[in-house]
């Protein structure tokens, strides 16, 4: 059995295509969510896998067993706190403060309860039992810190049983400056990756960075992006739930989606606000904004900006809907370019450099005045962009296909994992 361990929206986005491909190739696959706070039953990608007959469950539900009254009590507290947390996320803004505060405190208490269970019950013996009961041949994670959830115990148990571990991409690295994120240090990267047997990265840019950080080059293989492979994009289009009504497609208006990056990536928050106000005032345009899915506690930065919040709309649907996409450092530019739509890179909103910028595969915008001029120009002619198709082709080759000439990305993932799996 090939075990895939997931935790959040983004890693599920990148691991689902691989699990799907392996299942189609006849490999036994199971997907387990390590995060009790994530509602995996409402995730359309995991629902899709489950309908194919793939086992999808919470890890602690699948492999837990009764260990006494204290364990049962703590487990119940975790379950109830997760329910309260999900409820608080859907509360209206006019809900009394005390109710929001109560849900928040229950959620925090649930986290504490989970940590107590993890410390007292989810130990190395439990990890061994998971591998034995599942008949694991390989364990696959995203690029996760081993100290999170029960990852380190699973890695140790797998090593003791000679079962290989794989660290798979949960995104696409596109920053060409190493200081793109303050806490991303060489020491942190080395400690994060060196505990895994095999590390798969989407592009050479990411491999070179990890090697410079002290990660063994022998462990790293470049296989491209499963999430943006043509095979998965076509499949995802068939299964994704759509939220944008047909009436939101007036042909006379320019449809624009703005997808900023996480604020932690040296974002200029003042100019971000100015840009939102500029977009809100543009005539004959429909503009939606979708904050990054990992924005987390900084979501308040995007409130009251006079733009419709598209957080509940999938990125893939927004790329379909929009005539033009505005991006900063997000890999979503890849899907935009593969759909042959204009991609405007708002360089002035952060202090980083990017691969698509250096390859000339986008329209680089240096200030608010240039942005307004570019949008006015595209209103007249949506195809009038200052970058050529050859630049886009080279970008897609490096980012999606890992620099390879052949394009069977998912097949390469399946072949590599099965070739290095245990017996």
Label every PLM stretch briefly.
Residues 3-232, 333:
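Active-site and donor-binding regions of nucleotide-sugar-utilizing enzymes
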Residues 136-137, 317-328:
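Acidic donor-binding loop of glycosyltransferase active sites
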Residues 141, 201, 326-327, 365:
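Short beta-strand scaffold positions
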Residues 159, 319, 337:
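Short alpha-helix at the nucleotide-sugar/activated-sugar donor binding site of glycosyltransferases
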Residues 162, 323, 340-342:
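A short alpha->beta transition loop at the rim of the catalytic pocket in nucleotide-sugar-dependent
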Residues 214-217, 222, 293, 301-306, ...:
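Catalytic binding pocket for nucleotide-activated donors in carbohydrate/polymer assembly enzymes
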Residues 227-301:
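Conserved catalytic-core segment of nucleotide-activated headgroup transferases in glycan assembly
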Residues 399-423:
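C-terminal alpha-helical cap of glycosyltransferases
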């Amino acid at each position: 059995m090939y075990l895939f361990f997931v935790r959040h929206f983004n890693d599920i986005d990148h691991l689902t295509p691989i699990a799907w491909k392996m299942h189609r190739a006849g490999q036994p696959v199971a997907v387990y969510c390590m995060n009790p706070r994530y509602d995996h039953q409402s995730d359309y990608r995991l629902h899709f896998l489950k309908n194919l007959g793939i086992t999808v469950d919470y890890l602690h539900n699948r492999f837990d067993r009764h260990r006494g009254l204290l364990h049962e009590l703590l487990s119940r507290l975790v379950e109830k706190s997760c329910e309260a947390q999900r409820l608080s996320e859907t509360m209206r803004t006019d809900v009394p403060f005390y109710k929001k505060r109560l849900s928040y405190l229950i959620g925090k208490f649930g986290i504490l309860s989970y940590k107590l269970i993890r410390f007292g019950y989810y130990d190395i013996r439990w990890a061994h039992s998971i591998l034995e009961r599942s008949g694991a041949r390989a364990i696959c994670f995203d690029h996760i810190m081993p100290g999170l959830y029960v990852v380190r115990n699973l890695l140790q148990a797998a090593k003791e049983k000679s079962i290989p571990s794989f660290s798979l991409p949960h995104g696409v690295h596109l920053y060409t400056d190493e200081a793109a994120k303050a806490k991303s240090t060489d020491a942190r990267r080395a400690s994060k990756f060196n505990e895994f047997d095999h590390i798969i990265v989407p592009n050479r840019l990411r491999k070179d960075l990890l090697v410079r950080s002290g990660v063994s080059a022998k462990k790293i293989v470049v296989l491209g992006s499963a999430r943006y492979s043509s095979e998965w994009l076509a499949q995802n289009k068939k299964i994704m739930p759509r939220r944008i009504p047909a009436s939101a497609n007036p042909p006379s208006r320019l449809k624009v989606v703005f997808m900023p990056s996480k604020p932690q990536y040296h974002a200029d928050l003042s100019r971000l606000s100015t840009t939102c106000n500029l977009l809100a005032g543009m005539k004959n345009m429909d503009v939606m904004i979708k904050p990054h899915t990992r924005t987390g506690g900084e979501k308040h930065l995007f409130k009251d900006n006079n733009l419709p919040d598209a957080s509940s709309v999938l990125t893939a649907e927004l790329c379909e809907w929009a005539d033009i996409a505005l991006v900063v450092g997000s890999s979503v530019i890849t899907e935009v370019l593969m759909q042959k739509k204009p991609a405007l890179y708002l360089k002035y909103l952060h202090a980083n450099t990017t691969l698509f910028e250096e390859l000339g595969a986008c329209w680089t915008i240096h200030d608010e005045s240039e942005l307004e001029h570019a949008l006015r120009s595209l209103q007249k002619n949506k195809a009038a962009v200052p970058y050529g198709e050859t630049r886009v082709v080279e970008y897609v080759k490096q980012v999606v296909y890992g620099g390879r000439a052949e394009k069977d990305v998912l097949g390469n993932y399946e072949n590599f994992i099965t070739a290095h799996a245990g017996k």
